């Protein structure tokens, strides 16, 4: 099942349920991460951006934006990975994970 740990602002579930092909997934304030990826600092930063997005948008707001963006890209001929990488919430999380910058604040 895996270890569930409380951290400031989120719960981390190492060994929790993660979709096939993914290293981690965040639902609300719970970050589920594969054991092999638990030490990946960039991945954790990425997932913590999702925690902030869930908090900012709420459950329905996050899911609506995420799923509609994914569906739009799929409907426009992109495969799963390409559509996923174009979801604005994923783009934001990846940018902040790589740069440490939150350009929305400026």
Predicted regions located by residue number:
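Metalloprotease/metallohydrolase-associated module, dominated by Zn2+-dependent proteases
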Residues: 1-26, 35, 58-106
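Short alpha-helix carrying the canonical HExxH Zn2+-binding catalytic motif
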Residues: 37-53
């Amino acid at each position: 099942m895996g270890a569930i740990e409380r951290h400031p602002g989120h719960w981390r579930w190492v060994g929790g349920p993660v979709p096939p092909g993914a290293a981690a997934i965040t639902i609300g304030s719970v970050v589920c991460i594969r054991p092999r990826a638990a030490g990946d600092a960039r991945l954790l930063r990425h997932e913590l951006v999702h925690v902030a997005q869930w908090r900012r948008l709420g459950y329905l707001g996050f899911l609506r934006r995420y799923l509609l963006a994914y569906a739009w890209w799929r409907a426009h001929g992109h495969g799963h990975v390409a559509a996923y990488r174009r979801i604005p919430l994923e783009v934001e999380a990846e940018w902040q994970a790589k740069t440490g910058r939150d350009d929305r604040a400026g």
